[in-house]
């Protein structure tokens, strides 16, 4: 019975009832034990595997491994398909009218047909598709936002793309300094002063955990003095809104804003922060956005997400390791991580990772693997795993490092004074400067002593023309599959040869066996007639044909 003014009923009961419950429980357990005893203990049969004496053991094991791998890939693909279907259903349930009214006309206008994309993706090179999508975004946009990582702004700029935007006509280019909470404030201010001489620059810090539009969240009472989570806070959103809104008023028409940049600089996170909803897919892995995506911010401003730039293979090894999503697959992890480590300040790296001084990258990765408990069989340090760990930290959004801006500003060859003035026209730069100052004051960046100094390799060259892209090599999985198939074919040929040899050997053995049997029988008869010590089983009957002397 629930007592008045209390949330829960009392758990007290009479002793008779408690003992009765305990007795029932004991009887139930006794009954279960008795049934288990009757059934007996059946030891599970151990899989004996393929015996060593079995023919074609290696081929059988290889087939079993391939079958297991195919099943795992099929399960993973089914899981991804289910997730996509659930996301589609959730979007339709939450906003059933947004797709036909807003998104479909825009997709038709910008040429975003999913069936065409699927048909092209099966035939054409994926990098060529990225170039096509990037060109579509630049052509369809009135304002282009180039997102830069505040830790290395110069390394996140692509001169080829900027030159294409300048040559395309009346388009505005704005720089966004994202991840500004991962650099010291002094360094952020110096980079802002350097970049704003050339183009309008916005200090930004995207929210990595926006509200999911299809997820129903429970309201939880928050403490009065409790600060919001670091990942939920967004800085610079108001300044960017005012900048785009002011430009739209000067144009007196609806504008389209394209968001471009290298992989993992936070393009989709900026769109989600502006929309305050999970509109674009974001994640730790690089290069998740593979096609342009139209997101209406309001009636007058439409924002377009784009795939990342394609990094030219002629760049330095550190630029390839930090900017290319395929660097860890194409290049060996040790080479990519060593290139990053060579550009970082050794003393600050030692303090950050709490390792002793190192002479080379191999020694550093060995000590790091021991410190992090990354071991292989036999207690050997997993050096490759430590290299992958360092690469993931430096390309992620958690490690604090910074670069110094150049001492003197020199405009690139595709920029001149008239182009700089034209790019800044139509924007309220005074209000932008005030908003940037407020954002810098609000952002809690790391101290200089807690961040790592990095030597930037300068501008990163990209590829925007399809003719400059060479044909892609098959992916690692496809290459492995082809190698396995080739091995399987060669093994089958060798097996057939072995079978032929064995069969011919068997036939030869049969023929020789008959001859040998005749020879041996003759030999046996001769030995029987000449060996006197051997006991010979003969008939006791008297043989009249034999002359006994």
Curated annotation (Swiss-Prot):
Give start-end positions of Basic and acidic residues composition bias: 73-96, 474-483
Pfam families in UniProt: GN3L_Grn1 (PF08701), MMR_HSR1 (PF01926)
CP-type G domain residues are 131-312
Do you know which InterPro entries this protein is assigned to? G_CP_dom, Gnl3_N_dom, GTP-bd, P-loop_NTPase, TRAFAC_YlqF/YawG_RiboMat
Biased composition (Basic residues) is annotated at 1-45
GO CC terms: chromosome; extracellular space; membrane; midbody; nuclear body; nucleolus; nucleus
> Which positions hold the covalent cross-link Glycyl lysine isopeptide (Lys-Gly) (interchain with G-Cter in SUMO2)?
91, 99, 114, 179, 196, 253, 267, 275
Protein's cellular compartments:
Nucleus; Nucleus, Nucleolus
For the region Disordered, what residue ranges are annotated?
1-56, 73-104, 474-532
Recite the UniProt keywords alphabetically. Answer: Acetylation, Coiled coil, GTP-binding, Isopeptide bond, Nucleotide-binding, Nucleus, Phosphoprotein, Ubl conjugation
Q: Does the keyword Transport apply?
A: no
Q: Where is this region: Intermediate?
A: 282-456
Query: Where is the PTM Phosphoserine found along the chain?
Result: 101, 490, 504, 517, 529
In this chain, the stretch annotated as Acidic covers 465-543
Task: Point out residues bearing the modification N6-acetyllysine.
Answer: 79
Residue ranges with Polar residues bias: 518-529
Q: How does it assemble?
A: Interacts with MDM2; this interaction stabilizes MDM2. Interaction with MDM2 occurs in the nucleoplasm and is triggered by a nucleolar release mechanism, such as mitosis-induced nucleolar disassembly. Indirectly interacts with TP53, via MDM2-binding. Interacts with TSC22D1 isoform 2.
Official protein name in the record: Guanine nucleotide-binding protein-like 3
- Report the source organism: Homo sapiens
Recite the lineage of the species.
Answer: Eukaryota, Metazoa, Chordata, Craniata, Vertebrata
């Amino acid at each position: 019975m629930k007592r008045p003014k209390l949330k829960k009923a009392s758990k007290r009961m009479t002793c008779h009832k408690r003992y009765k419950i305990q007795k029932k429980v004991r009887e139930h357990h006794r009954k279960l034990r008795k049934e288990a005893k009757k059934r007996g203990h059946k030891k599970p049969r151990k899989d004996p595997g393929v015996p060593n004496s079995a023919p074609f053991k290696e081929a059988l094991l290889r087939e079993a491994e391939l079958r297991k791998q195919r099943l795992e890939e099929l399960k993973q693909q089914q899981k991804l398909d289910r997730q996509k279907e659930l996301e589609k259903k959730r979007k339709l349930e939450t906003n059933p009218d947004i797709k036909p009214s807003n998104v479909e006309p825009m997709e038709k206008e910008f040429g975003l047909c999913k069936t065409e994309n699927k048909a092209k993706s099966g035939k054409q090179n994926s990098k060529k598709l990225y170039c096509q999508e990037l060109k579509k975004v630049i052509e369809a946009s009135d304002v282009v936002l180039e997102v830069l990582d505040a830790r290395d702004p110069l390394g996140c700029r692509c001169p080829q793309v900027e030159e294409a935007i300048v040559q395309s006509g009346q388009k505005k280019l704005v720089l966004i300094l994202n991840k500004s909470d991962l650099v010291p404030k002094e360094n952020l201010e110096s980079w802002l002063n350097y970049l704003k001489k050339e183009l309008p620059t916005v200090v930004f810090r995207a929210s990595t955990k926006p509200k999911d539009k299809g997820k129903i969240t429970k309201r939880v009472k928050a403490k009065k003095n409790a600060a919001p989570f670091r990942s939920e806070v967004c800085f610079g959103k108001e300044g960017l809104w005012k900048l785009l809104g002011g430009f739209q008023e000067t144009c007196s028409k609806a504008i389209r804003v394209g968001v471009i940049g290298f992989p993992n600089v936070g393009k989709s996170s900026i769109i989600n922060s502006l929309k305050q909803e999970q509109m674009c897919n974001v994640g730790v892995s690089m290069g998740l956005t593979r096609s342009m995506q139209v997101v209406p911010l309001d009636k007058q401003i439409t924002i377009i997400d784009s795939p990342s730039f394609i990094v030219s293979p002629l760049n330095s090894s550190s630029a390839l390791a930090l900017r290319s999503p395929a660097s860890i697959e194409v290049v060996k992890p040790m080479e990519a991580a060593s290139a990053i480590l060579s550009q970082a300040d050794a003393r600050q790296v030692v303090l950050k990772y709490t390792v002793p001084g190192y002479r080379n990258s191999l020694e550093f990765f060995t000590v790091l693997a021991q410190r992090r408990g990354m071991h292989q069989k036999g207690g050997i340090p997993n050096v490759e795993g430590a290299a992958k760990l360092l690469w993931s930290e430096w390309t992620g959004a958690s490690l604090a490092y910074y670069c110094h801006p150049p001492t003197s500003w020199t405009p690139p060859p595709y920029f001149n004074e008239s182009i700089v003035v034209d790019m800044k026209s139509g924007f309220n730069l005074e209000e932008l400067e005030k908003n940037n100052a407020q954002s810098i004051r609000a952002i809690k960046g790391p101290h200089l002593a807690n961040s790592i100094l990095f030597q930037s390799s300068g501008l990163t060259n990209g590829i925007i023309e399809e003719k400059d892209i060479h044909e892609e090599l098959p992916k690692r999985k496809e290459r492995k599959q082809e190698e396995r198939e080739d091995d399987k074919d060669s093994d089958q040929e060798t097996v057939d040869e072995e079978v032929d040899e064995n069969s011919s050997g068997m036939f030869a053995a049969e023929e020789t066996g008959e001859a040998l049997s005749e020879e041996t029988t003759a030999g046996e008869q001769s030995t029987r007639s000449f060996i006197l010590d051997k006991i010979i089983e003969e008939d006791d009957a008297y043989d009249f044909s034999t002359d006994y002397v």
